[in-house]
């Protein structure tokens, strides 16, 4: 009977360790995805802020040549 208890304890322990490792990997993956989304948003904001400057530059060039 003691052998069964030890075996059961070992199986449960290894299962919990495995579950913990899987959850940690999942959390790391989600953090990387969130960081990537934040980077994409900041790049988009920088690009959108350049549009008015580009329009002004094009209109200045058009006035100079036209």
UniProtKB/Swiss-Prot annotation:
Stretch forming the signal peptide: 1-22
Modified residues (Phenylalanine amide): 65
Entry GO terms, CC: extracellular region
Stretches that traverse the bilayer: none
Domain of life of the organism encoding this protein: Eukaryota
Compartment(s): Secreted
Keywords on record: Amidation, Amphibian defense peptide, Antibiotic, Antimicrobial, Cleavage on pair of basic residues, Secreted, Signal
Main function: Has antibacterial activity against the Gram-negative bacteria E.coli ATCC 11775 (MIC=7.2 uM), and the Gram-positive bacteria S.aureus ATCC 12600 (MIC=3.6 uM) and M.luteus ATCC 49732 (MIC=1.8 uM). Does not inhibit the growth of the fungus C.albicans.
Similarity-based family: Belongs to the frog skin active peptide (FSAP) family. Phylloseptin subfamily.
The protein's name in its UniProt record: Phylloseptin-Az2
């Amino acid at each position: 009977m003691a052998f069964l208890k030890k075996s059961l304890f070992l199986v449960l322990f290894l299962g919990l360790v495995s579950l913990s490792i899987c959850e940690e990997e999942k959390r790391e993956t989600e953090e990387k995805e969130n960081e990537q989304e934040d980077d994409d948003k900041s790049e988009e904001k920088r690009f959108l802020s350049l549009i008015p400057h580009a329009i002004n530059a094009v209109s200045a060039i058009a006035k100079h040549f036209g």
